Each structure stands twice: as structure tokens, then as C-alpha cells.
């Protein structure tokens, strides 16, 4: 089982980034235009999140259609923070199930999800079935 510090060290090595002398409870990594934040929350889980800037977050129903169920536990989930009502895209996985590539894959899926949200034009919400 990895500790949070070991997981961050491994991820920074994979990204060819210099490993911080002190690993803070929340670590930030810039991937392209996205600031991705990594923390252990709840205990035993690696949580990654980013704050995508969405052109029109008034259409929450349409944006939430991206939250379709998936077999992939790393698929990002779109939410809104309680305080400011800003969009938050996040995913997490258990520390005890990490392997050599799972953190990198988790970060990659988070960034791909943020890119999809920002570059795709808003699609119509799913049709209701009668």
C-alpha cells in the first residue's frame, strides 16, 4: 500500500517534475491550461480535482449529462461547490489499489474530462423516455 507522500513522489517522477522537499496536504500540478489539485480525501483515497471555466454554467442540467455511469472508477464527476457555485471536476481512487500507472491515468482522465467540458459545445440534455 502506498502512502500519500509515496504516491505523489511516484507521480512527480512519471511527469518528470522535481519532487517537492515538503509534500503539502494539497499539491497542485499544472497540466496544459488546467491547475489540478491532489489531496488525500477521505483518508485512504487520492482525490484529484480541477476548476474548469465553463462558458455558460447556467445550463447545469446539460453539463451534468456528462456524469453518466461508467465502469471506470477514474471517470471524472462534475459537481458545483457549495460556497461559490463554481464547477468542480473531480475523481478519486483508493490508495491501496494504486499501481505504477494508475495515478498518471487518473490525472490524464481528469484533464481529458476538463478539456471535453471546455471544448465541446453544450449538447442537448438526454431525451426523456415515455
UniProtKB/Swiss-Prot annotation:
It comes from the Bacteria. It holds the Pfam family CesT. Positive regulator of YopE. It comes from Yersinia pestis. The lineage of its organism: Bacteria, Pseudomonadati, Pseudomonadota, Gammaproteobacteria, Enterobacterales. Keywords: Activator, Plasmid, Transcription, Transcription regulation, Virulence. This is YopE regulator. GO terms for biological process: protein secretion by the type III secretion system.
